[in-house]
Swiss-Prot record:
One Pfam family it belongs to: MutS_I
GO molecular-function terms, A-Z: ATP binding; ATP-dependent DNA damage sensor activity; damaged DNA binding; mismatched DNA binding
SUPFAM superfamilies: DNA repair protein MutS, domain I (SSF55271), DNA repair protein MutS, domain II (SSF53150), DNA repair protein MutS, domain III (SSF48334), P-loop containing nucleoside triphosphate hydrolases (SSF52540)
GO term, biological process aspect, one: mismatch repair
Protein name: DNA mismatch repair protein MutS
Family indicated by similarity: Belongs to the DNA mismatch repair MutS family.
Gene3D superfamilies reported in the protein's UniProt record: 1.10.1420.10, DNA repair protein MutS, domain I (3.40.1170.10), MutS, connector domain (3.30.420.110), P-loop containing nucleotide triphosphate hydrolases (3.40.50.300)
Length: 852
């Protein structure tokens, strides 16, 4: 389309749009936000709104779609939720005063990582992440624009970056360096992230400070630059970037957290059925967010853990006071989000009223905490700043019945501003004067139905029906003629109306100005409000953990430095809650200081996975400061939990079950320390039997000899139980069963020693497989059990003297009439797996599989 054929208004649109090619441009035109060209076509499909055209009679009509400005937020939410950016172009001058095209500018770009306003409020954090790279090191910074939280760290490799992004549940990543194509594919295709480029930094000494490393400062400044470039305003609520290190917390990958159902149920993706669901008895949005953080990042500093435990104990010891505290927290609104709305200049009267109500609750909360009379609460009490001067300002300035908008009036309390009160008096007395005029003229004219009405076009007028027109006084002048009546005015009525309209206009302007000044004063308190929010959130989380501990009969864990695990009659917190206390069978877990590995055998569906998850959840709960479901708990402080639980293929990246198993095993073996916890469930089942058994044995021995981490290893390879003869730090345990009259009952109880049967056929029977099939399986099993697999004991790991799996066939069966040993077996025996990395083992096994 030739440029000369484009109207000035559309040229303005195109000039703005070229600066935001990756965003939907919402172009304000009167009472609507309009979209044009491809934006209109796509938005019409996504939002299910009408697609029209701006110039229907032209050869190439311009596609157009629009949404009302007063309901635009809901449409913006849909676009952003689907991963799009939305640029908002507002009218920057009154169209009535404009000369030519109304001036318009983009005032904000809303992206998935920068959502502040939403028609669907969510108490969860919405983190925007930035990544940068110098040499082989990665910098990562993240921020919640809606709360002001701001952090930065350094990471060793790209896999750690991806894991942290997943842990943060980020939807958008700002990239500050040239990504490798393969890395970009991982972020976009596997992690489903929106990527934005930012190569410039935003220099702000107040927010970046000097506590960060150079790389952390670089990535944090690029994140800050992106936020300022999209939000286009000063954001006084942003907090100073805080340095953190992954090792400061109990390290867990996203896959580990998912397999343990920490924040959501892995099967449903919902909160219900997760540890978060179980522990969440918070009463505030801030408390809920902080609880998620505590679950997501348990502590490794024992003193900090005990500090939390001490406060929970105080709450447990004072039931009635705690109940009062819980009740008082219900009156607390989301201070962090309210502060951000003030900073964005979007806080309305209702927001300030909520803030005022919250501040009024603080002295009550503080008094209750003081009534506990315990030194454990002294730190929290110091942080509970009630801000009485701010509470007084809001209470005296804002009418408690004020509307949500700032243009309708009725915002400021009577008595707050003398001039405003005068205008209101004129309006109030004017109404009384009008009533007096109406009564006077009704009596003088004899028109019994005479009344004064008002509309925006005619102002105040006397309404006279046609039947009474002959009685209209001479000093009335006609303002409008209708079918059945006429409207009249008088000089006296016009004078009163003029005074009232002037007072109303001045009152409205003054009230708006007063509200803006009050909001500016509130903004000065943002730092103190954010500190108060953190203190209240901490109180809320600790009372929530106390309530959960009391309700579910949890105990306070203790910690030791001898690498002992002693959990007496422990329970899986979530499974117990779902099943009911009466149905759940507790299990004792014991690792003395010399025991590092429990090799767990037993039938499928018998409770092996629950038993292992029980330990992992107990560690998470203990190190976040919570109490634990058991009769007693004594644990070391772990630095990390590594898991391989479940056998789902990674279909997105094309990785098989076996590949995923080996990669997760490799991560554990490479990174675990003697202070780590490893949970491996049926490792090796993703490949052929002997491949899997060989790898399982080699991994067990590697952990035993070189890693030394506390490990639970569940396996269906019963032959591996013989390892207890050669590995001094390994013990066998199994799930007990009861056989009676041919029926098998799983007791869900862990006992010492190896299992003697797998009971797989019994599980198949429970699943409902046909009887004929089960009988045939039983026959085949009897024949197969004639084979024995002997794992040679190992006294020393070396390339000259290493264990090997040898198969001795004691009985030929019909399934294998022509059995001959495959030469690949000898190659397998020759593998020097004890001097190979897990990844090398995996590649070697893959090569051998190709030869089969």
């Amino acid at each position: 389309m030739a440029k000369e054929k484009i109207s000035p208004g559309m040229q303005q649109y195109l000039d703005i749009k070229k600066n935001y090619p990756d965003a939907f441009l919402l172009f304000r035109m009167g009472d609507f936000y309009e979209l044009f060209y491809d934006d209109a076509v796509k938005a019409a499909q996504i939002l299910e709104i009408s697609l029209t055209s701006r110039n229907k009679n032209a050869d190439n009509p311009i596609p157009m779609a629009g949404v009302p400005y007063h309901s635009a937020q809901a449409y913006i939410d849909v676009l952003v939720e689907m991963g799009y950016k939305v640029a908002i172009a507002e009218q920057m001058e009154d169209p009535k005063q404009a000369v030519g095209v109304v001036k318009r500018e983009v005032v904000q770009v809303i992206t998935p990582g920068t959502v502040v306003d939403s028609s669907k409020p969510d108490s969860a954090n919405n983190f925007l992440v930035a990544i940068d790279k110098v040499g082989s090191r990665f910098g990562l910074s993240y921020m919640d624009v809606s709360t002001g939280e701001f952090f930065a760290t350094e990471l060793d490799d790209f896999s750690s970056v991806c894991s942290e992004i997943q842990n943060l549940k980020a939807r958008e990543v700002v990239v500050g360096y040239d990504l490798l194509e393969t890395d970009e594919q991982v972020l976009v295709n596997q992690l489903n992230l929106l990527l934005s480029k930012e190569t410039e930094g935003y220099d702000d000494v107040h927010l970046i400070g000097n506590s960060l490393t150079d790389l952390e400062s670089s990535v944090a400044s690029k994140l800050l630059q992106y936020v300022h470039r999209t939000q286009m305003r000063e954001l006084s609520h942003l907090q100073k970037a805080q340095h953190y290190e992954i090792k400061d917390y109990l390290q867990m990958s996203y896959a580990t957290k998912s397999s343990l159902d920490l924040l959501e149920n892995a099967r449903t993706g919902k909160k219900h059925g997760s540890l978060f669901w179980l522990l969440d008895k918070t009463k505030t949005a801030m408390g809920m967010r902080l609880l998620r953080t505590w679950i997501d990042r348990p502590l490794v500093n024992q003193a900090s853990i005990i500090e939390r435990q001490n406060i929970i104990q105080v709450f447990l010891d004072n039931f009635f006071e705690r109940s009062d505290l819980t009740e008082s927290l219900k009156g607390v609104y989301d201070i962090e989000r309210l502060a951000s709305r003030v900073s964005f200049g979007k806080a309305n009267p209702k927001d300030l009223i909520q803030l005022g109500h919250t501040l009024a609750q603080v002295p009550i909360i503080k008094a209750i905490l003081e009534s506990f009379n315990d030194d454990a609460l002294s730190g929290l009490l110091q942080e509970l700043d009630a801000l009485p001067e701010l509470e007084s300002l809001i209470r005296s300035a804002i009418d408690p019945d004020a509307p949500a908008t700032i243009t309708e009036g009725g915002i400021i309390r009577d008595g707050f501003d003398e001039t405003l009160d005068k205008y209101r008096k004129v309006m109030s007395e004017g109404t009384s004067w009008i009533a007096d005029i109406e009564a006077k003229e009704r009596e003088a004219s004899g028109i019994t139905t005479l009344k004064i009405d008002y509309n925006r076009k005619d102002g105040y007028y006397f309404h006279v029906t046609n039947s009474n027109l002959s009685l209209v006084p001479d000093h009335f002048f006609r303002k409008a003629t209708l079918k059945n009546s006429e409207r009249f005015g008088t000089a006296e009525l016009a004078k009163i109306e003029g005074e009232m309209l002037e007072a109303r206009e001045k009152s409205s302007t003054l009230e708006y100005d007063i509200f803006m000044r009050v909001r500016e004063q509130v903004e000065r308190y943002i730092d103190r409000l954010q500190s108060l929010a953190k203190a209240i959130a901490t109180v809320d989380v600790l009372q929530s953990l106390a309530v959960t501990a009391e309700t579910n009969h949890y105990v306070r864990p203790v910690f030791n430095d001898e690498h002992r695990i002693a959990i007496d009659r422990g329970r899986h917190a979530v499974v117990e809650k779902v099943m009911g206390v009466q149905e759940y069978i507790p299990n004792t877990i014991t690792f003395d200081s010399q025991t590092n590995i429990q090799l767990i055998t037993g039938p499928n569906m018998s409770g092996k996975s629950t038993y292992m998850r029980q330990l992992a959840l107990s560690v998470v709960m203990a190190q976040m400061g919570a109490y634990v479901p058991a009769d007693s708990v004594d644990l070391p402080v772990f630095d990390a939990i590594y898991t391989r639980i479940g056998a789902a293929d990674d279909l997105i990246s094309g990785q098989s079950t076996f590949m995923v198993e080996m990669m997760e095993a490799n991560q554990a073996i490479k990174r675990a320390t003697p202070n780590s916890l490893i949970i491996f469930d049926e490792l090796g089942r993703g490949t052929a039997t002997y491949d899997g058994m060989a790898l399982a044995q080699s991994i067990i021995e590697f952990i035993h000899d070189k890693v030394g981490a506390k490990t639970m290893f569940a396996t269906h390879y019963h032959e591996l139980t013989a390892l207890s003869n050669s590995l001094t730090h390994l013990v066998n345990v199994h799930v007990a069963t009861l056989e009676k009259d041919g029926e098998v009952t799983f007791l869900h109880k862990i006992v010492d020693g190896p299992a003697d049967k797998s009971y797989g056929i019994h599980v198949a029977k429970i699943a409902g497989l046909p009887t004929d099939l089960l009988n045939r399986a039983d026959t085949i099993l009897t024949q197969l059990e004639g084979e024995t697999v002997v794992i040679q004991p190992q006294e020393k790991v070396s390339s000259q003297e290493k264990p090997a799996i040898e198969t001795h066939v004691n009985e030929q069966i019909s399934l294998f009439d022509d059995f001959t040993e495959n030469p690949v077996l000898q190659e397998l025996r020759d593998l020097d797996i004890y001097n190979m990395t897990p990844m090398q083992v995996m590649m070697a096994v893959a090569d051998l599989k190709q030869k089969l």
